[in-house]
């Protein structure tokens, strides 16, 4: 495709995981909304997560498309369709997905060359792409799927190693050098921060690639974590732009929200929507633990009992555990809740944006994945925090200690995303958090009020003159200047 004069042309390359794909695709759609030509490169199975959204945008005349590449499943010994790090991916297959991804690197680099973009935006887990961009003489911008606080906290642990001073795994220590006095325990830290492993080396490579990049993009906004936005730019010494909340900005009507992710059949949507619409305002608890988490049977029992005993209506998003007592238990529980009309179970993917904005929802129990935290802020909802893996425990600190819009369930132990872990949070702890979250007494000192105020700030950030809107316009302006400067050099006569 020929580039028009003055038109910016870009490539967006997500990682092979739904929680990374969705926000980066929303960012790509925002660039197209601002008249930047966008090509998203991914594999066939992963494209199904967002293709409906791209088709919608293209039908509106926006310059955006998907370029699908074949995942080398046969070469790495994987069944067709297993090409992402998701809840249904068997643990033993994850190393082969990494192998397949490494084989795709040459394919991606060739596309960078052939499509002739003016810049690329790639996920943090593509650190090699900064050198690929340098070869082409174009900027690479890194996408971070986490919060500014989480990245700042990880840097604090790497630089100061405060966990090594703790005598026991459960002893609390302060994370040095941060804008707030945040306490953690060793058990709450990701394993790669506790002691060096292969992932530690990968994260070092990612940090080095970020410092060589033109800058980084975050799904955040200034009023949400302003101190950490400034702190992170200071410690990294690089440019960074918060252009969130991207889900709010890129999905401003019901059609967009319904198309996002693994869209359900219409009759399935009507089921939960009809149930929700029959409930009183702010009376329903939403319970979801993200797109890649599974719980053991023992934990499912504790959650179910806590929800049933709470007396509150609830929607619970549950995952198939490949048969066994966990699935059987949930099916029986679902029948009982249908009979009492107290609970509604959604199996698999849930249209979270549509659910959270429903006036019946009064709060949510969340794993503190960053996408969900931001979407909860958009909706003005307080949270009961249940961190599990990745940077979740850092995000909990932002929600509970900094923003004061959440109450902790009491999870104490970090685990890998594809493991159950040894911790089982008891129904009493879950019940206490739910009671505090859904209380109408405001004993928390205004948690619900603060959540509503942040929702207003989120909406202001993406309006003309808002912090995220200004960041987007400034970044595009800089990228246009780089393009024009490059073109001037290429057309200048030789001395």
From Swiss-Prot:
<dbReference type="GO" id="GO:0035251">
    <property type="term" value="F:UDP-glucosyltransferase activity"/>
</dbReference>
<protein>
    <recommendedName>
        <fullName>Soyasapogenol B glucuronide galactosyltransferase</fullName>
        <ecNumber>2.4.1.272</ecNumber>
    </recommendedName>
</protein>
<feature type="active site" description="Charge relay">
    <location>
        <position position="123"/>
    </location>
</feature>
<comment type="similarity">
    <text>Belongs to the UDP-glycosyltransferase family.</text>
</comment>
<feature type="binding site">
    <location>
        <position position="390"/>
    </location>
    <ligand>
        <name>an anthocyanidin</name>
    </ligand>
</feature>
<keyword id="KW-0328">Glycosyltransferase</keyword>
<dbReference type="Pfam" id="PF00201">
    <property type="entry name" value="UDPGT"/>
</dbReference>
<feature type="binding site">
    <location>
        <position position="349"/>
    </location>
    <ligand>
        <name>UDP</name>
    </ligand>
</feature>
<feature type="binding site">
    <location>
        <position position="375"/>
    </location>
    <ligand>
        <name>UDP</name>
    </ligand>
</feature>
<feature type="binding site">
    <location>
        <position position="18"/>
    </location>
    <ligand>
        <name>an anthocyanidin</name>
    </ligand>
</feature>
<feature type="binding site">
    <location>
        <position position="372"/>
    </location>
    <ligand>
        <name>UDP</name>
    </ligand>
</feature>
<keyword id="KW-0808">Transferase</keyword>
<dbReference type="InterPro" id="IPR035595">
    <property type="entry name" value="UDP_glycos_trans_CS"/>
</dbReference>
<feature type="binding site">
    <location>
        <position position="20"/>
    </location>
    <ligand>
        <name>an anthocyanidin</name>
    </ligand>
</feature>
<feature type="binding site">
    <location>
        <position position="367"/>
    </location>
    <ligand>
        <name>UDP</name>
    </ligand>
</feature>
<feature type="binding site">
    <location>
        <position position="291"/>
    </location>
    <ligand>
        <name>UDP</name>
    </ligand>
</feature>
<dbReference type="GO" id="GO:0102240">
    <property type="term" value="F:soyasapogenol B glucuronide galactosyltransferase activity"/>
</dbReference>
<dbReference type="InterPro" id="IPR002213">
    <property type="entry name" value="UDP_glucos_trans"/>
</dbReference>
<feature type="binding site">
    <location>
        <position position="350"/>
    </location>
    <ligand>
        <name>UDP</name>
    </ligand>
</feature>
<feature type="active site" description="Proton acceptor">
    <location>
        <position position="20"/>
    </location>
</feature>
<feature type="binding site">
    <location>
        <position position="371"/>
    </location>
    <ligand>
        <name>UDP</name>
    </ligand>
</feature>
<comment type="function">
    <text>Glycosyltransferase that transfers a galactosyl group from UDP-galactose to soyasapogenol B monoglucuronide in the biosynthetic pathway for soyasaponins.</text>
</comment>
């Amino acid at each position: 495709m020929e580039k028009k004069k003055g038109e910016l042309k870009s490539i967006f390359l997500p990682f092979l995981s739904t929680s990374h794909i969705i926000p980066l695709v929303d960012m790509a759609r925002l660039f197209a909304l601002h008249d930047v030509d966008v090509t998203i490169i991914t594999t066939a199975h992963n494209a199904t997560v967002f293709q409906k959204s791209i088709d919608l945008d293209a039908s509106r005349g926006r310059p955006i498309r998907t370029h699908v590449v074949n995942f080398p499943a046969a070469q790495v010994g994987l069944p067709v369709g297993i090409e992402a790090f998701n809840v249904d991916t068997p643990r033993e297959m994850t190393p082969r997905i990494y192998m397949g991804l490494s084989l795709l690197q040459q394919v991606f680099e060739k596309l960078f060359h052939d499509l002739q973009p003016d810049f690329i935006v790639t996920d943090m887990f593509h650190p090699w792409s900064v050198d690929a961009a340098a070869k082409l003489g174009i900027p690479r911008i890194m996408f971070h799927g986490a919060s500014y606080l989480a990245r700042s906290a990880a840097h604090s642990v790497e630089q100061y190693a405060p966990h090594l001073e703790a005598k026991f795994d459960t002893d609390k220590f302060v994370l040095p050098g941060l804008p707030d006095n945040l306490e953690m325990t060793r058990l709450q830290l990701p394993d790669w921060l506790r002691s060096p492993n292969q992932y530690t080396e990968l994260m070092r490579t990612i940090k080095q690639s970020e410092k060589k990049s033109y800058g980084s993009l975050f799904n955040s906004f200034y009023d949400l974590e302003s101190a950490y936005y400034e702190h992170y730019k200071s410690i990294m010494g690089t440019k960074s732009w918060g252009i969130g909340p991207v889900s709010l900005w890129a999905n401003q009507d019901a059609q967009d929200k319904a198309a996002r992710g693994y869209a359900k059949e219409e009759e399935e949507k009507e089921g939960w929507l009809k149930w929700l619409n029959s409930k009183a305002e702010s009376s329903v608890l939403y319970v979801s633990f993200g797109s890649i988490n599974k719980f053991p049977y023992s934990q499912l029992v504790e959650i179910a009992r806590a929800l049933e005993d709470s007396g509150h209506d609830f929607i619970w998003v549950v995952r198939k555990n490949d048969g066994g007592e966990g699935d059987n238990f949930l099916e029986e529980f679902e029948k009982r809740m249908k009979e009492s009309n107290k609970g509604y179970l959604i199996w698999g993917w849930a249209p979270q944006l549509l659910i959270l904005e429903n006036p019946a929802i009064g709060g949510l129990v969340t794993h503190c994945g960053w996408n969900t935290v931001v979407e909860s802020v958009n909706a003005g909802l307080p949270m009961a925090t249940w961190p599990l893996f990745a940077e979740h425990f850092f995000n909990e600190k932002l929600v509970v200690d900094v923003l004061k819009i959440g109450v902790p369930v009491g999870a104490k132990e970090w685990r890998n995303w594809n493991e159950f872990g040894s911790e089982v949070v008891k129904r009493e702890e879950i019940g206490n958090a739910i009671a505090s979250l859904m209380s109408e007494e405001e004993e928390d000192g205004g948690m619900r009020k603060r959540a509503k105020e942040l929702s207003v700030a989120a909406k202001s950030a993406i309006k003309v003159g808002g912090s995220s809107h200004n960041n987007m316009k400034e970044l595009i302006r800089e990228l246009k200047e780089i393009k024009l400067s490059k073109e001037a050099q290429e057309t200048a006569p030789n001395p």
